[in-house]
UniProtKB/Swiss-Prot annotation:
GO cellular component: nucleus
Primary location group: nucleus
Listed GO MF terms: DNA binding; DNA-binding transcription factor activity
Feature: DNA-binding region: 63-88
Source organism of this protein record: Lotus japonicus (Lotus corniculatus var. japonicus)
Location of the motif LHEQLE: 139-144
Gene that specifies this protein: IPN2
Additional information: Roots of plants silencing IPN2 exhibit decreased rhizobial infection and nodule organogenesis under nitrogen limitation when inoculated with Mesorhizobium loti.
Protein's name according to its UniProt entry: Myb family transcription factor IPN2
Example GO BP: nodulation
Amino acid sequence: MERMFPPKKPSTMNSHDRPMCVQGDSGLVLTTDPKPRLRWTVELHERFVDAVTQLGGPDKATPKTIMRVMGVKGLTLYHLKSHLQKFRLGKQPHKEFNDHSIKDGMRASALELQRNTASSSAMIGRNMNEMQIEVQRRLHEQLEVQKHLQLRIEAQGKYMQSILEKAYQTLAGENMASAATNLKGIGPQTIPDMGIMKEFGSPLGFSFQDLDLYGGGGGDQLELQQNMEKPPLDGFMPMNHENLCLGKKRPNPYSGNNGKSPLMWSDDLRLQDLGSCLQDDPFKGDHHHQIQIAPPSLDRGTEMDPMSEIYDSKPEEKKFDASMKLERPSPRRAPLGERMSPMITTGTMAQGRSSPFG
């Protein structure tokens, strides 16, 4: 190799006068080492790659064919052979250039990857934050809705409770008002009922007395019946011996000058018959108990005797024994029709005799 380059070195050194580098007319750059070496520049490497490509690749290309295709003066087979071998092994002759390019590419790819990763991570983080914010917002809205519904339910319950309380109060007030009205209505209504009982008590009592008198029961049975009928009337109304009389008073045009009218029975004709029969009653003197009944009189203006004088027995007479009278069986009587017919006949005759109108 040294034999091939001796004439080239002095010419290069003479032309440039530089001991460090020698450059020929072909553009080759050689080192200034004791054994000069060819430096593959970028242009020279590009021409080598083009020649290899034209020849069909590094496997088909040979140093001779490459040297013929390149046509560079000063380029020997040694240079091409070593460079082709490195090229085939993938090692570029221009190491620094390749290292820088590789490093730059790796840096660029790393930066791009970092950028992509950062952007993707930023997007992912942003999306995650947005999703978390959206989830929190929806949860907050659901909580607000639940709270609102709870408030509405509580308000509805309070409203229903107030309505029920008002209804209870209204019903209680109505019940109290109706009860008070009933109490007010019951108070004055009892008095007329008592008056009605007082009015109808004596005529009903005397109807049974008339039957007893005309049936022959005697004064004892009449007194017993009167004593048994008196307690219910005494329980309903207070006894006033001065004002309570048999029957009720009616205005009488035939009364005297003292202004008091005699007792008028509800049935005048029947009571006149009763008085006439009592005057002629044969059983009047046979019993120990005497009953005083004053017949109505139109001529005198005196007042009727009170009930106490009529029904009370005389001091010298014996008191009535209710147990004795209840134990004694009553005599057998005739039917009611047979007893009423003589009563009506006798009453008609007595009326003809004692009627002031007739």
